[in-house]
């Protein structure tokens, strides 16, 4: 790779451990670079300022690394073996919260590999994207724009949100932020969560039975983390409770839904969805979701806004600095 596309600090300090960012999205280059001075005399860092999902390229770029900052790609079992068994990587710092779908955590733990994540860095970003998807389902602005551009002035009837029931499955930082936005729209918010610690003065109704959230809501928004107890927690049973005309939004993790269940429900054609997260990313060209006109798709970008990028990059750099100085900041247990 051309040297102009690499940013490297303290290259002469071969006594220091090497951190590599093998791929990155353009909007994150400057925020990351701004935090590199925090690693002075702690570690060298090498950032490749482009984005690729080519495994061979990623492995070549990380062959001398002791820590890898992971942005936008999965650490498959093959990559994990290459980096930690045949390579020297002892720490992965992920630019995201839910890492269970990005790396085999049990294997990493067994090998003594540190895995770090970032927390609450983009609660507002994800919540705003979730609500943007809700608005798109309700008002179909994208389709209206396409209509006008092709000379069609017929329009589409929208769906008003005031007074509608929004069901939140999950009520952490993101879910609470969505609830605040929904309160501003005058929506009635129903919440299911395994544990709710205070409602922060929000106008919400707690529902003990998740099935009832699906049955009663006009719009459902998912905000559960991916944990051992949440993988596949939403099944065809809940999805079948959705009323005709209702909508579901997922900006959390695809794996919290039983594999294939949402696609099958959408193929019946009487409900709509907006999805930002998928079982396989990038979404394969032959995925049946691509052929459905009752679903809005975005490429796992709910977390990506200017403020979230600043928060994320600082936490990632702090995590690797902590690792190399004996701390455990943002270490995934």
What are these regions (language model features)?
Residues 65-145, 159:
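Phosphate/diphosphate ligand-binding glycine-rich loop within oxidoreductases
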Residues 1-67, 186, 324:
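N-terminal glycine-/charge-rich "phosphate-binding" loop or analogous flexible N-terminal tail
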């Amino acid at each position: 790779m051309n040297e102009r596309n690499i940013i490297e600090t303290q290259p002469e300090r071969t006594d220091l451990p090497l951190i590599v960012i093998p791929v990155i999205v353009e909007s994150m280059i400057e925020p990351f670079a701004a935090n590199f001075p925090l690693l002075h005399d702690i570690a060298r860092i090498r950032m490749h300022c482009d984005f690729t999902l080519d495994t061979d390229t990623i492995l070549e770029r990380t062959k001398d690394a002791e820590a890898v900052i992971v942005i936008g790609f999965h650490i498959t079992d093959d990559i994990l073996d290459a980096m930690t068994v045949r390579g020297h990587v002892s720490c992965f710092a992920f630019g995201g919260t839910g890492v269970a779908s990005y790396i085999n955590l049990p294997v990493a733990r067994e090998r003594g590999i540190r895995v770090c994540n970032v927390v609450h860095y983009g609660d507002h970003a994800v919540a705003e994207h979730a609500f943007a998807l809700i608005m798109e389902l309700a008002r179909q602005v994208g389709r209206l724009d396409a209509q006008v551009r092709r000379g069609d002035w017929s329009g589409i009837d929208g769906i008003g949100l005031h007074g509608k029931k929004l069901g939140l499955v999950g009520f952490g930082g993101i879910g609470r932020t969505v609830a605040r936005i929904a309160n501003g729209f005058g929506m009635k918010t129903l919440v299911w969560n395994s544990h709710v610690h205070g409602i922060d003065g929000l106008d919400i109704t707690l529902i003990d039975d998740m099935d009832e959230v699906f049955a009663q809501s006009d719009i459902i928004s998912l905000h559960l983390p991916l944990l051992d107890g949440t993988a596949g927690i939403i099944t065809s049973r809940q999805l079948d409770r959705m009323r005709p005309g209702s909508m579901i939004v997922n900006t959390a993790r695809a794996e919290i839904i039983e594999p294939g269940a949402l696609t099958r429900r959408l193929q019946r054609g009487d409900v709509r969805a907006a999805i930002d997260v998928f079982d396989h990313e990038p979404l394969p060209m032959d995925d049946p979701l691509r052929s459905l006109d009752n679903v809005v798709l975005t490429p796992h970008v709910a977390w990506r806004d200017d403020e979230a990028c600043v928060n994320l990059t600082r936490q990632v750099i702090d995590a690797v600095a902590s690792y190399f100085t004996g701390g455990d900041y943002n270490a995934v247990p």
